[in-house]
From Swiss-Prot:
Coiled coil: none annotated. Residues 26-53, 167-177, 243-257, 312-315, 373-379 are periplasmic. Belongs to the chloride channel (TC 2.A.49) family. ClcB subfamily. Its main location: membrane. Residues 1-4, 75-145, 201-221, 279-290, 337-351, 401-418 are cytoplasmic. This is Voltage-gated ClC-type chloride channel ClcB. It holds the Pfam family Voltage_CLC. Probably acts as an electrical shunt for an outwardly-directed proton pump that is linked to amino acid decarboxylation, as part of the extreme acid resistance (XAR) response. It comes from Escherichia coli O157:H7. One of its GO terms (molecular function) is voltage-gated chloride channel activity. InterPro entries: Cl-channel_core, Cl-channel_volt-gated_ClcB, ClC, ClC-type_chloride_channel. One of its GO terms (cellular component) is plasma membrane.
Length: 418
């Protein structure tokens, strides 16, 4: 047992450095090509001229597509093993390391050029790759899946500053394939990754700063649960839209570079209306949580951002949709809260409360992982007073979504790329 905990610690350290490496590479490219040192792609887009704002995501998608197509032609074969940590966990615990690194580099290109795709997907993949590389060198084959799971959980902890949620995400996704005893190393890796990441970044701040002064009352629990029902209906709709957009792009029968460029061009066009469509949505989420906008502003940004996410994911841009899903959930919750706020004197607090609830419940509805979703929002914001209500709402959202749409966002993604 001591041996496993020691390896879990090493995996956590490796994962933290993998995530930090990707983050610093992203910041470097943003500084070189966008003259942006704020770390916010929305700020970068705001400061660009309209023609650069239009073309930059398209050029980034084109470059990523050329890289992926060039690698496939160079090797003259498709990847001989998984290039996704979820697939590796569901098969024999091995990666195609070279193809996975190329995929991560392609993700770096589309992320830094403004596509509405999550950067954390590549971060978690790199963390899992580092764990897998170490495991194949120093551990027996039957443990490889465990250490990939530890690496993925550690990557999520370092990226989202949510070690418990990262650990439970792995446990919920792998329910039935991992023994409960295996959670120990997973949690150790996640916590170590968070601590090392804090040391690297010289900060232990929460991912999102929220000033929620409301004390949750019976009325608020009713509103939280009703938001869970709404998210349970919206989750399957979002997954259906993503699948339809993916099939639409595939039906065009474009070469990968042009397909990714088209997705980027759509994001560029939308950014002419609002630069908030650039990036994974992190900075927009923070601005909404700091000062919830008016109903029509939320609705406008929501529609543009939703279309940008659908275009980016549908075109096959390498990256995650975890953080974009958080923004969509926040917007849905805030739209609902703003509508209800017309009849309540504390409309601002209700809007913020239901925005946080929307983040958790839509995440639960799309991942079918309610416990992870609840803990993730609490860990990212520090609002642990919401935990009981969020847990009930997330379970309801997950049950409704699973009834209407059997596959989670991860199973759907695997099916699309298999």
């Amino acid at each position: 047992m001591f041996r496993r905990l020691l390896i879990a610690t090493v995996v956590g350290i490796l994962a933290a450095f993998a995530v930090a490496g990707f983050r610093h590479a992203m910041l470097l490219l943003e500084w070189l090509f966008l003259n942006n040192d704020s770390g916010s792609l929305v700020n970068a887009a705001t400061n660009l001229s309209p023609w650069r704002r239009l073309l930059t995501p398209a050029l980034g998608g084109l470059a990523a597509g050329l890289l992926l197509m060039g690698w496939q032609k160079f090797t003259q074969q498709r990847p001989h093993a998984p290039t996704d940590y979820m697939e590796a966990l569901q098969t024999d615990g091995q990666f195609d390391y070279a193809a996975s690194l190329v995929k991560s580099l392609a993700s770096l290109l589309v992320v830094t050029s403004g596509s509405a795709i999550g950067r954390e997907g590549a971060m978690i993949l790199l963390a899992a790759l580092a764990a897998s590389c170490f495991a194949q060198r120093f551990t027996p084959r039957q443990e490889w899946k465990l250490w990939i799971a530890c690496g993925a959980a550690a990557g999520m902890a370092a990226a989202y500053r949510a070690p418990l949620a990262g650990s439970l995400f792995i446990a919920e996704v792998l329910f039935g394939t991992m023994m409960l005893a295996s959670l120990g190393p997973v949690i150790i890796s996640a916590v170590v990754a968070l601590l090392v990441s804090n040391l690297i970044n010289h900060s232990d701040a929460l991912l999102y700063s929220v000033q929620l002064s409301v004390t949750v009352q019976a009325r608020d629990y009713a509103l939280i649960i009703s938001t869970g029902v709404l998210a349970g209906l919206c989750g399957p709709l979002l997954l259906t839209l993503m699948n339809a957009c993916h099939r639409g792009f595939v039906s065009l029968k474009l070469a990968p570079p042009w397909q990714l460029a088209l997705g980027g061009l759509i994001v560029g066009l939308l950014s002419l209306f609002t630069p908030a469509v650039w990036g994974n949505g992190y900075s927009t989420v923070q601005s909404f949580l700091t000062a919830p906008p008016l109903l029509m502003i939320i609705a406008g940004i929501f529609l543009c951002k939703l279309c940008a996410v659908l275009a980016s994911s549908g075109s096959g841009a390498p990256g995650g949709v975890f953080t974009p899903t958080l923004f969509i959930g926040l917007a849905i919750g805030m739209l609902y809260g703003r509508s209800l706020g017309l009849w309540f004197p504390d409309g601002e607090e209700i809007t913020l409360l239901l925005g946080l609830t929307g983040m958790a419940t839509l995440l639960a509805a799309t991942t079918h992982a309610p416990i992870m979703s609840t803990l993730m929002i609490c860990e990212m914001t520090g609002e642990y007073q919401l935990l009981p209500g969020l847990l009930i709402a997330c379970v309801i959202a997950s049950v409704i979504s699973r009834t209407l749409h059997r596959d989670s966002i991860y199973r759907q993604h695997t099916a699309q790329h298999s």
